[in-house]
Design a protein with these regions (language model features):
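Basic, flexible Lys/Arg- and Gly-enriched helix-loop patches that mediate nucleic-acid binding at interfaces
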Residues: 1-216
């Protein structure tokens, strides 16, 4: 139904509201957090080995907000491997989470890697052209060498692929094993100055930008 006059009543539990094609969040219990996942934390809700998991950061946030219903549960959106740190979302917005993880909506992700050895000029070109891995070809959209020397280099890489450990495998394939890796951007979102272990709720503008990215 298209509404052209103010004052029309809607039920946010059964109706979806859109403005200029973008979904408008009307449920205050829909929460999406940005987490700076520390290295060593497992991206899972429960770990049989007893290692720290990202689920604890969601529980901590909810514990700090007793006004929210006890039934709320924040789930990780996608994953980062255990030794990778950086930007990870925790959310109870099922539709947004589903689209962010769906292969047809692969959004750009930017990582900063500290690698072994000095990166030669051919390496970024090779990564952009594509590398054949055991599960198919992988290529970067953009590669920037931030610093390079015999003792190690800093490489920023942006790509759309969501394959497991893809950045580590690509850099290893060109002779530069990763010693530290952090995701700094996810689509329109930037990690900014969020410190490891910290969380913050996404702003309305950030939610709207994510929705636009995945066609909501």
């Amino acid at each position: 139904i298209t509404v052209t006059e103010p004052g029309v009543r809607v039920d946010p539990l059964t109706q979806e509201i859109r403005l200029d094609g973008s979904r408008v969040l009307t449920d205050p219990e829909l929460i999406t957090l940005m987490l700076h996942k520390p290295a060593g934390v497992v991206t899972t809700m429960e770990d049989p080995e007893g290692r720290p998991t990202v689920a604890q950061y969601g529980r901590d946030y909810l514990a700090e907000h007793p006004e929210l219903p006890d039934s709320l549960r924040l789930v990780h959106v996608g994953r980062l491997d255990t030794e990778t740190e950086g930007l990870l979302l925790l959310s109870n917005d099922g539709e947004l989470s589903h689209r962010l993880m769906h292969p047809s909506f692969e959004i750009a992700k930017t990582y900063v890697a500290i690698v072994e050895g000095q990166v030669e000029p051919w390496v970024p070109r090779k990564l952009r052209r594509g590398i054949e891995l055991e599960d198919g070809e992988a290529k970067a959209d953009r590669v920037t060498v931030k610093d390079s020397g015999p003792r190690g280099s800093i490489v920023e890489i942006t790509l759309h692929s969501g394959k497991n450990r893809i950045v580590r495998r690509m850099l290893d394939a060109v002779g530069h094993p990763v010693t530290r890796l952090a995701r700094t951007r996810l689509g329109p979102l930037r990690l900014g100055n969020l410190r490891p272990g910290q969380t913050r709720p996404l702003s309305g503008e950030e939610i709207a930008a994510l929705q636009q990215e995945v066609g909501l």
